[in-house]
UniProtKB/Swiss-Prot annotation:
Plasmid partition require REP1, REP2, and a cis-acting DNA sequence (known as STB). REP1 may act by intercalating in the yeast nuclear matrix and binding STB either directly or via REP2. It comes from the Eukaryota. The keyword Protease does not apply. GO terms for biological process: plasmid partitioning. This is Trans-acting factor B. Residues 239-253 have a biased composition (Polar residues). The gene is P. It comes from Zygosaccharomyces rouxii.
Amino acid sequence: MFTSQDARDSRPDRELRMMNDVLMTYPYTVIHLPAQNMLSTAKGMVNIAENYRDYPILAIFYVKYLMKKLPYGVIPVNLEWPEPYVVLNTILKRLKEHKFFANKDKEDFAERLHKLIAPDVSIPESRKDEILGQQKKERVVTKTINENFLDPVNARPRLQRFFEKLHNGTLVENLEVGLCKVEILVSSKAMLGQSFKLQIMAANVRELWVGEMVCNMITNETDYGFDEGGGDDDEGSSVEVQNSQSASPGQDQEAQRAPEAPETSSQLFDKIVSALQDDPDSAKAQLGQCRKLASYLLSHKREQEDFFMQTKDTRARLYLDLKGCLGSSWKFSIYRGVRCKQNGQLKVSLKPSNSGHLSGFWVNIKMTSQGNTLDDIRLQVRCDILGKDTNRRGGSEKDPEDQSETESSG
């Protein structure tokens, strides 16, 4: 008879789970085709560089790293590959920093892994700390520009003129080297007025925050517990606890006797969105409910697919809302996706077309309220204007906030 102990023994041991985490085995699927010296991914085929031919684990890891970093981007067939030791360093660093090694010999394990996946790759002594995504030497900030567009009087034409100068390069003239940091604050209420459009935009922000948060939880199952400072389960269930405490003893006994009807994904989603609408500051308290929804969708694949598609549609609607507020006649595209913060804010990456001197935009979306009533949706737009010399050498597409803030990507 299959006992509970047999079930425990049949589970992957902690070492295997750790290796799955370190090598990002899930959720990214990359297949090695040794005969063609290529990798097959959901985003197409990728040629493996010659110096990676004998190290397919390194090649697979690098492509998975790019898939995680650029979830909505395109991975070209002919990639620009870093030195193999950089990828190896990254893997070994992830291994050593894994929570599994709280009281274990991580150096010995790292040495064994090195010999297993890349025995002939040597790491130069001066390059032992060089890893993927490492922040390059910061460019000198030679100028900063801050503008607010909060007054509804002439807000739209003022913003339009500002963007025109930003786009054609006349906002900052004679910037030869370094960069200019630009930050503007836009009031959606000033752009849209106290109209139905503002309410629709607020609904899209709430729905997209829930959608992105749940999709991130589903995609990153290993991060399900929010180890990095997220709200805990007690916090997430605080609304239900308060309701239970306020019920009378008779109601409480009746509730215990009555069978609880299972909630569907749409019911759970609507409950979270309604809670955010009733209390705009309750985002962190809803993380527990988001986990509950993610757990449900993990066991209902068809509904999970529909949920991902619904979130994609909401993302497209919010993009139209942003264009309506920013009022720019030049084209944007969502570049590096959307990040959701646990406090309910969203960050959207936008890339303007035909603007090589701009590094791209990050728009931080924050709803403000008076009591429980929506007051405004503030858009904090940040970008870097690259100096002419910097632009010729190729500008960075990183988040302008990354110099002062470390944040998870979802």
